[in-house]
Amino acid sequence: MADEEKLPPGWEKRMSRSSGRVYYFNHITNASQWERPSGGSTVGGSSKNGQGEPAKVRCSHLLVKHSQSRRPSSWRQEKITRSKEEALELINGYIQKIKSGEEDFESLASQFSDCSSAKARGDLGPFSRGQMQKPFEDASFALRTGEMSGPVFTDSGIHIILRTE
C-alpha cells in the first residue's frame, strides 16, 4: 500500500492533463516528477534533526537578480535593471537547458549567477536551518540529494537550487 503512505513534506499528488498520468509536485521547491518521492516517514539517525531531515544540507544555486531584489547589483553587473518577469524567463531558460542536457548546472551557475558563489560554480557549502532566507531554506531541505528545484523566489532574486549533499 505504498500509495497510501504519507508523502514527504511539500509533495502532493497531481494528475497530468496532457498524459492522464499521476505525477508528484513539490510546492516548496516547484519540482515535479513522475516517480513517487521517497523519505516521507523516516525519522532518526545521528545526522538528522529529529524531524526526519538532515541537520545540514549542501547546495549550489544559480541566482538571477532583478530590479526589485534587495541589492540589485552583482559581481557581473553594477546596476541590475531587468524586471522580475525577465529574471523568471532567464531562470526558466536555464532550467530547460539543464533538463535537456544542453548545459550543466555548474557551468551555467559560474557564467550567469548574480551571486559571488558563481566563482565556486554555485556551491554554497553546507548550511543548517536558520542560515538562509526562509524560502531558500525550505526548498533546500525539501530537495533530495541530486535533485534540482524549479524557480525559488527570495528577497535576493530568483534561484535554481541543486542539492549536492
UniProtKB/Swiss-Prot annotation:
InterPro entries on file: PPIase_dom_sf, PPIase_Pin1, PPIase_PpiC, PPIase_PpiC_CS, WW_dom, WW_dom_sf
Record note on disruption phenotype: Animals display more and larger germinal centers. In response to intranasal administration of IL33, lung inflammation is reduced compared to wild-type and is associated with low infiltration by inflammatory cells, especially granulocytes, a severe reduction in Th2-type cytokine secretion, including Il4, Il5 and Il13 in bronchial alveolar fluids, and reduced up-regulation of Il6, Csf3, Cxcl2 and Ccl5 mRNAs. In addition, the increase in IRAK3/IRAK-M protein levels in infiltrated inflammatory cells is impaired.
GO biological process: negative regulation of amyloid-beta formation; neuron differentiation; positive regulation of canonical Wnt signaling pathway; protein peptidyl-prolyl isomerization; protein stabilization; regulation of cell population proliferation; regulation of cytokinesis; regulation of protein stability
EC number(s) recorded for this UniProt protein: 5.2.1.8
SUPFAM superfamilies linked: FKBP-like (SSF54534), WW domain (SSF51045)
Phosphoserine modifications at: S73, S110
Sites of N6-acetyllysine modification: K48
Pfam family, one: WW
One GO cellular component term: nucleus
Mod. after translation: Phosphorylation at Ser-73 by DAPK1 results in inhibition of its catalytic activity, nuclear localization, and its ability to induce centrosome amplification, chromosome instability and cell transformation. Ser-73 is dephosphorylated upon IL33-stimulation of dendritic cells.
Domain PpiC, first and last residues per copy: 54-165
Localization per Swiss-Prot or TrEMBL: Nucleus; Nucleus speckle; Cytoplasm
Annotated stretches, region: Disordered: 33-56
Stored CDD domains: WW
Chain's role: Peptidyl-prolyl cis/trans isomerase (PPIase) that binds to and isomerizes specific phosphorylated Ser/Thr-Pro (pSer/Thr-Pro) motifs. By inducing conformational changes in a subset of phosphorylated proteins, acts as a molecular switch in multiple cellular processes. Displays a preference for an acidic residue N-terminal to the isomerized proline bond. Regulates mitosis presumably by interacting with NIMA and attenuating its mitosis-promoting activity. Down-regulates kinase activity of BTK.
Subunit structure: Interacts with STIL. Interacts with KIF20B. Interacts with NEK6. Interacts (via WW domain) with PRKX. Interacts with BTK. Interacts (via PpiC domain) with DAPK1. Interacts with the phosphorylated form of RAF1. Interacts (via WW domain) with ATCAY; upon NGF stimulation. Interacts with PML. Interacts with BCL6. Interacts with FBXW7, disrupting FBXW7 dimerization and promoting FBXW7 autoubiquitination and degradation. Directly interacts with RBBP8/CtIP; this interaction depends upon RBBP8 phosphorylation.
Protein name per UniProt: Peptidyl-prolyl cis-trans isomerase NIMA-interacting 1
Underlying gene: Pin1
